[in-house]
Amino acid sequence: MSSNKIVLSSSDGESFEVEEAVARKLKIVEHMIEDDCVVTEVPLQNVTGKILSIVVEYCKKHVVDEESDEFKTWDEEFMKKFDQPTVFQLLLAANYLNIKGLLDLSAQTVADRIKDKTPEEIREIFNIENDFTPEEEAAVRKENAWAFE
């Protein structure tokens, strides 16, 4: 494993110096390294410093690809620290940076948080306006009564 350092720079100018092995967890960076496009610094224009610091923490923990109960427990506790807007930003960053494990974890966290919520509660979480008339909503509920049981 290489001990080279790479600086990851966020959209708001924060820099994070990490081991190459950690940087390679970001597949977008790994492809740059493999294509000899990375010298020492990688600008990540779609990720803020706040979110990049969380991504770096996750990648440092997961630098060794290992599936175990310890990782699962750590992942669950890790995600509990973040509010919904932060989880959404992590989801977007994980997608942009191509970090499958973090993408899956973020998506599962969102799914777990909306599980057993009413449509109104889900609309509030996602800031979605209800554009159904009361009549249309009643028709949809009647048509899909099994889903509301």
UniProtKB/Swiss-Prot annotation:
Function: Involved in ubiquitination and subsequent proteasomal degradation of target proteins. Together with CUL1, RBX1 and a F-box protein, it forms a SCF E3 ubiquitin ligase complex. The functional specificity of this complex depends on the type of F-box protein. In the SCF complex, it serves as an adapter that links the F-box protein to CUL1.
Organism, scientific name: Arabidopsis thaliana (Mouse-ear cress)
Annotated GO CC locations: nucleus; SCF ubiquitin ligase complex
Pathway: Protein modification; protein ubiquitination
Keyword Aminoacyl-tRNA synthetase listed: no
Main location: nucleus
UniProt xrefs under SMART domains: Skp1
A GO biological process held by the record: response to auxin
Nucleus in keyword set: yes
Protein's UniProt name: SKP1-like protein 14
Tissue expression pattern: Restricted to inflorescences, pollen and leaves.
